[in-house]
Regions:
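N-terminal acidic leader/helix
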Residues: 2-28
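Short, charge-rich amphipathic interface segments used for partner binding and complex assembly
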Residues: 15, 19, 28-64
Length: 65
């Protein structure tokens, strides 16, 4: 996600996490923990736009513990 500011990037990440939480509520077979880890490892970490601590804080904000 090159070329976007950090605030916009955080908004996108938060929206994605909220969507994952919504999916977990509606689909009992959806593995929220595994998908959250996958999202971090394949998207957040390589893009290096936010730190792991910032990602974990966003997770807490949307209800992922």
């Amino acid at each position: 996600m090159n070329g976007i500011d950090k605030e916009t990037y955080i908004g996108i990440v938060k929206f994605t996490l909220e969507s994952m939480v919504d999916l977990a509520k509606s689909d009992k077979n959806y593995n929220l923990a595994a998908d959250t880890i996958h999202y971090y490892e394949t998207t957040i970490k390589p893009e290096m736009q936010i730190s792991q601590d910032e990602f974990l804080e966003l997770c807490k904000e949307v209800g992922i513990k």
